[in-house]
Amino acid sequence: MAAKDVKFGNDARIKMLRGVNILADAVKVTLGPKGRNVVLDKSFGSPTITKDGVSVAREIELEDKFENMGAQMVKEVASKANDAAGDGTTTATVLAQSIITEGLKAVAAGMNPMDLKRGIDKAVIAAVEELKKLSVPCSDSKAIAQVGTISANSDSTVGELIAQAMEKVGKEGVITVEEGSGLQDELDVVEGMQFDRGYLSPYFINKPETGSIELESPFILLADKKISNIREMLPVLEAVAKAGKPLLIIAEDVEGEALATLVVNTMRGIVKVAAVKAPGFGDRRKAMLQDIATLTAGTVISEEIGLELEKTTLEDLGQAKRVVINKDTTIIIDGVGDEAAIQGRVAQIRQQIEDATSDYDKEKLQERVAKLAGGVAVIKVGAATEVEMKEKKARVEDALHATRAAVEEGVVAGGGVALIRAAHAIAGLKGDNEDQNVGIKVALRAMESPLRQIVVNAGEEASVIANKVKAGEGSFGYNAYTEEYGDMIAMGILDPTKVTRSALQYAASIAGLMITTECMVTDLPRDDKGADMGAGGMGGMGGMGGMM
């Protein structure tokens, strides 16, 4: 086991604070509408230019191991805020730096670290309650666009795109961000249920100009089995032919004689059929077939529950207004499923999302909710160069997370104003003893730091503006972009409540741990020079290298 380097008390805290400051100073230059860029060197390819706090934090690794521990703990603040709300990483870092700096000063002055931490925690709990009171719902497109714009560093086109996407696919819909091929940002919306399975035979194509199959008001047969024997299918095919409607078959697979017969029937015009494989694999396929059944008011024909293909009637088939199939995807538009049944299914999947442990499962379940609830929107980001593309894509993703958070918990006045109002509302809070009171003051002072940093980055005098904002009330604040005072909500400067709340909670959590640190342990750097020159197996002669 390697020898350890151990530092105690003030020595440890000074080193840790130095690491905190290096990381926080690098991150906080990006805060606000006039925040600066940070250039990150990459071991291959061109450097990355970013204004995203968490991207900067992730790149920082310090040589001094004690300093690095401080930096890594603050990096954790940014990561946690990012995971919880997808934004607010820079705000969280600025808050953490302020609480740690002020807290360690108090520890150096002889305060009890545990009481300081209790005071900080008390203040944060009270401030979070105040933020909830200040929060207003974010329901209309205008507010959503404003939140997106602020999070994308005042890029209004991004805010508008996100608002349009949310309008099209609903608040629950899946919105993905991809790299586009042109200079302009684009929005593609896929309405209805789409899954990644195309036609099983090109002979089903009835729209040769687009290479796709379009079925109007089709019946939909859902089978959780391979279909290879056409005899099983005959009763259904005859019933569908009599009804004079097309048929879409979604099954584990359709092969051999069954597929050949379906193709021949389609080409002769006896019955219009298309067949696709069911989406997903294993249990996920069963669940997705059930989703489609709910959406189209059909029944999944599965031998597990005693249903056989030969006995299938038109009542067992689902229906939709339209189905479009190409070689890779199938889209079911306007299924006739009962709205209450669809909502019930969505609620059931939501419960599974809460119980899911892996991110992959959560993502897949979220996709299923979106497909049932509305549709999928794809924002294609346009840019002139690859470097700009990466930077912009990261900003759009941030903005998307922020708007989701805003829809979830509402919005508060942006520009650091909400924290100042929350701090003012709890200014009379008292702890159990004097040290806790100091902890409360540390937290209250830290809540001013985001506003101060936004102002500093805009090249203005922080104290003057902070005092003027503190003297105001409600959503009165300072717009660093236009350099004027006014009602932040009216000016469209909004922050999602969830983002502000998460930033404060995670910053206080990690800062509290760091203030109460008394000892730090790390590996001593290994000095291999002397050992290498020693005589291998001769126990006490390891130092012979020095005699040369």
From Swiss-Prot:
Pfam families: Cpn60_TCP1. It comes from the Bacteria. ATP binds at T30, L31, G32, P33, K51, D87, G88, T89, T90, T91, G415, D495. One of its GO terms (cellular component) is GroEL-GroES complex. SUPFAM superfamilies: GroEL apical domain-like, GroEL equatorial domain-like, GroEL-intermediate domain like. Keywords: ATP-binding, Chaperone, Cytoplasm, Isomerase, Nucleotide-binding. Its EC number is 5.6.1.7. It is found in: Cytoplasm. It catalyses: ATP + H2O + a folded polypeptide = ADP + phosphate + an unfolded polypeptide. One of its GO terms (biological process) is chaperone cofactor-dependent protein refolding. Its main location: cytoplasm. InterPro entries: Chaperonin_Cpn60_CS (IPR018370), Cpn60/GroEL (IPR001844), Cpn60/GroEL/TCP-1 (IPR002423), GroEL-like_apical_dom_sf (IPR027409), GROEL-like_equatorial_sf (IPR027413), TCP-1-like_intermed_sf (IPR027410). The keyword Cytoplasm applies. GO terms for molecular function: ATP binding; ATP-dependent protein folding chaperone; isomerase activity; unfolded protein binding. HAMAP family: CH60. Belongs to the chaperonin (HSP60) family. Forms a cylinder of 14 subunits composed of two heptameric rings stacked back-to-back. Interacts with the co-chaperonin GroES. Together with its co-chaperonin GroES, plays an essential role in assisting protein folding. The GroEL-GroES system forms a nano-cage that allows encapsulation of the non-native substrate proteins and provides a physical environment optimized to promote and accelerate protein folding. This is Chaperonin GroEL. It comes from Yersinia pestis.
